Amino acid sequence: ELDLACLERIQQRENHVGAWIHLDEDQALDQARACDRAKPEGPLHGIPVGIKDILDTRDMPTCYGSPIYEGHQPVNDSSCVSFLRNAGAVILGKTVTTEFAWRKPGKTANPHNPEFTPGGSSSGSAAGVADFMVPLAIGTQTGGSVIRPASYCGVVGFKPTFGHLSVAGVKPLSHSLDTLGCFVRSAEDLRIFRQAIWNVSEEESPDNNFPKIGFCRTPDWEKAGPSTQNALEHARQTWSSQGVEIIDVQLPEEFSALGDAHGCIMVYEAGQNLRYELSHHHALLSKRLRSYFEK
């Protein structure tokens, strides 16, 4: 019933939101029926999931947000998709990504207001979860591609520590920075997903009842608007009143150049990882992407 409800929601809203680049309803329903007949064997049994279209899927096209790869069919699943299948998840389809998970946006609109951006690069995954098309969607982050669209669309975005989730079978942009993440609608849903991927229970976390949270204003704090600063200060006060230990984090002066360093690493490694596309399909790349390598 959950999978059918998600598909019905997609039929109603996809023309307005544009979260999906590939959707196979028959295949999704076949997976769901197989889950209904089978004994639950995984922590995500029967849960519908959207997959960002830079993760390889053996039974669905993977286009990486580029016309260069239109109709491209990988032979194998990415490591993440393979895990999801083994955990019992139903793969509904592929969600819209920006071109190679970088700057050029796709068709996705913000589900709360079509005149607003959903954020990128994991646009479709964030918008699909926000619009109740799917309860869980996978994204990636090289700069802010999970936490930004999660914020813009009003959902929970989870970007784990770099290297905790395998990026095998994910089209690389910057191999020193690329990180898998996910979108859900609540902290409780995130807890379930976290337990599924790491097979860890809350009881195994000794500091769970009294977490410590670092509050870091960063060198860019003054660039934030008053409403943003007030929201963060309010969150700090709320956490503190609930027994959370708040630790003020002061970054060394050297961290003020971190953003520029990140940009240099990202552009350099993207040039390496997109060398084939730049050499053989230059005209099919967006002007915006080409401009990064013509400076």
Q: What do the PLM-derived regions correspond to, one by one?
A:
Residues 1-73, 101-102, 232:
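Short, well-ordered alpha-helical
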Residues 6, 28, 190, 213, ...:
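Residue-level signal for inorganic ion chemistry
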Residues 44-64, 210-212, 264-295:
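Short helix-loop capping/hinge segments that flank enzyme active sites or metal/cofactor-binding pockets
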Residues 46, 179, 195-264:
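Gly/Ser-rich, acidic/histidine-flanked active-site/gating loops
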Residues 50, 68-72, 178-185, 293-295:
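Short, well-ordered beta-strand elements within core beta-sheets of diverse protein domains
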Residues 76-194:
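Short glycine/serine-rich loop segments
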Residues 106-113, 258-273:
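Charged, often glycine-rich, active-site loop that binds/positions anionic groups
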Residues 187-198, 271-276:
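Conserved core segment of the aminotransferase class I/II
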